[in-house]
Structure formats: structure tokens, C-alpha cells
């Protein structure tokens, strides 16, 4: 995997510029017409694929790594899971907690690095999700290892990120950020994109076995997202411990 170059402090796997970027947008997390519109649009697809793969979430302990404002966390809690969401952007967590109070959905939000949580709660979660997060940290392989450590034996770990190739640069950066303006400019750095083969290798090294992949595609004419077999740009990967 390629890695970002900035970290807030030695030993902390975080790019402070990324934290500040999402903190600045925190108040708009739950506005479906904001910069987070794509996340609202793809969330039913992500949740559906998780349930299709791992089965019912009812009563299961679930960890959402890089939860942001809680879009996926809340939907998994509504599906019956006992959800913990972690993120290092305090402003995003504040919005997540506030929205949880307003919606009556219970999620335990914590500002803690996933590596630190892995030492506190190893093998405690039936399902771990790490969506649209790996491309925003200096050492994605470290996050993969921590996610693996947090999962119970037989537990599921789900990742989603961006492939690294000319098409993904054209679609995810030029198209999404500059032409269609689906995302703010500077949301992504091409050097931080991760090929499926790289993610699969990191997963196996961490004791996870990849079990499936799906691509996510956007139709600019219908403005609809869908899951597909095309993993050339956005993709999801399921793994099992």
C-alpha cells in the first residue's frame, strides 16, 4: 500500500490535515445535499452488502472505524447492532452524538485510534467496518492489522476504498471533484489510493481471509449509485478472521 506523508505525532497513525479537513465540514455531515451527499447515497448499498454477507446484525457487536458523523454507524444500530463508532475528528463525533440524541439511535462514539482500541478490546467484535477511511491515513496496513485484532474469531471485517489506476484518477478526482463537483476539491490524494491486491495482501498478513469484492459505480445521468463487479474505481472488500 502507498501511504500519506503527514502525521500529527510520532506513533499516532493519523494525517492531521485529513482530520482538519473533515472537522471543517463537520456541521454538514447530516445534510443529504451537502458535500456528504455521496455518502448518504451509497450508505444503503454498504449496509445491504454487509447484511447480505455477514447476516443479520441484530444483537451483534459492531465497530465502525473512521465513523465520521455516524451515517453508517446509525444505520447499523437501527438494524439492531450494538455499535461503537471511533474517529479522531472530535467535531465530527460531536455531530454524531448530537444526531444520535435527535434520532433516538444509540451508538457509543469514542475518539480513540483504532490501534489503541485493539490493545484494549482484542477479539471483541462480530463485525468491524472501515469504510472510506484507509485512503486518509499514513499507514493503512496498520489500520487493517488493528481491525483484524478487534474482530472475534470467525468475525467479519469490511473495507471500502479507492483503486489506484488511471481510471480511478480520472473518475474519483478529476470527475468527482472538478467536473461533477460531487466532492470538495482535495478530498482525495491519488498516491493514497489502494489496489485490491494490496489490500488483500495486507488483510492476509493480518490474519484475515478476503471472501468477496464489489465495485460501486455512479451514473451521472441518473445520479444513481449501484454495486457491480467493476472494482476499477470504488470498491468494497469483505474479509473473515
Swiss-Prot record:
Annotated GO MF terms: 2-polyprenyl-6-hydroxyphenol methylase activity; 3-demethylubiquinol 3-O-methyltransferase activity; polyprenyldihydroxybenzoate methyltransferase activity
Binding residue positions for S-adenosyl-L-methionine: 46, 66, 87, 131
Alphabetical GO biological process terms: methylation
Catalytic activity: a 3-demethylubiquinol + S-adenosyl-L-methionine = a ubiquinol + S-adenosyl-L-homocysteine + H(+); a 3-(all-trans-polyprenyl)benzene-1,2-diol + S-adenosyl-L-methionine = a 2-methoxy-6-(all-trans-polyprenyl)phenol + S-adenosyl-L-homocysteine + H(+)
Disulphide-bonded residues: none
Matching InterPro entries: SAM-dependent_MTases_sf, UbiG_MeTrfase
Cleaved signal peptide residues: none
Enzyme Commission code: 2.1.1.222, 2.1.1.64
Tree of life domain: Bacteria
Keywords: Methyltransferase, S-adenosyl-L-methionine, Transferase, Ubiquinone biosynthesis
Key word Oxidoreductase present: no
Broad enzyme group: transferase
Pathway: Cofactor biosynthesis; ubiquinone biosynthesis
The keyword Cell membrane appears for this protein: no
TM regions (residue ranges): none
NCBIfam families, per the entry: UbiG
Family: Belongs to the methyltransferase superfamily. UbiG/COQ3 family.
Functional summary from the UniProt entry: O-methyltransferase that catalyzes the 2 O-methylation steps in the ubiquinone biosynthetic pathway.
HAMAP family, per the entry: UbiG (MF_00472)
Name of this protein: Ubiquinone biosynthesis O-methyltransferase
The organism of origin for this protein: Bordetella bronchiseptica (strain ATCC BAA-588 / NCTC 13252 / RB50) (Alcaligenes bronchisepticus)
Gene: ubiG
Amino acid at each position: 500500500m502507498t501511504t500519506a506523508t503527514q502525521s500529527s505525532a510520532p506513533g499516532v497513525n493519523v494525517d492531521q490535515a485529513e482530520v482538519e479537513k473533515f472537522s471543517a465540514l463537520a456541521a454538514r455531515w447530516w445534510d443529504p445535499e451537502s458535500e456528504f451527499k455521496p455518502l448518504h447515497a451509497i450508505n444503503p448499498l454498504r449496509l445491504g452488502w454487509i447484511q447480505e454477507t455477514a447476516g443479520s446484525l441484530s444483537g451483534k457487536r459492531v465497530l465502525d472505524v473512521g465513523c465520521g458523523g455516524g451515517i453508517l454507524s446509525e444505520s447499523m444500530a437501527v438494524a439492531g447492532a450494538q455499535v461503537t463508532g471511533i474517529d479522531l475528528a472530535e467535531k465530527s463525533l460531536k455531530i454524531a452524538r448530537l444526531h444520535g440524541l435527535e434520532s433516538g439511535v444509540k451508538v457509543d462514539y469514542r475518539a480513540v485510534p483504532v490501534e489503541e482500541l485493539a490493545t484494549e478490546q482484542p477479539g471483541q467484535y462480530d463485525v468491524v467496518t472501515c469504510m472510506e477511511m484507509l485512503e486518509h491515513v499514513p499507514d493503512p496496513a496498520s489500520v487493517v492489522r488493528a481491525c483484524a485484532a478487534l474482530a472475534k474469531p470467525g468475525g467479519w471485517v469490511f473495507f471500502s476504498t479507492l483503486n489506484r489506476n488511471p481510471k480511478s484518477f480520472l473518475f474519483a478526482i478529476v470527475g468527482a471533484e472538478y467536473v461533477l463537483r460531487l466532492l470538495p476539491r482535495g478530498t482525495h490524494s491519488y498516491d493514497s489510493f489502494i489496489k485490491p491486491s494490496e489490500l488483500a495482501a495486507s488483510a492476509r498478513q493480518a490474519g484475515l481471509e478476503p471472501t468477496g469484492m464489489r465495485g460501486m459505480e455512479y451514473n451521472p445521468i441518473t445520479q444513481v449509485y449501484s454495486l457491480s463487479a467493476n472494482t476499477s474505481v470504488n470498491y468494497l472488500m469483505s474479509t473473515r478472521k
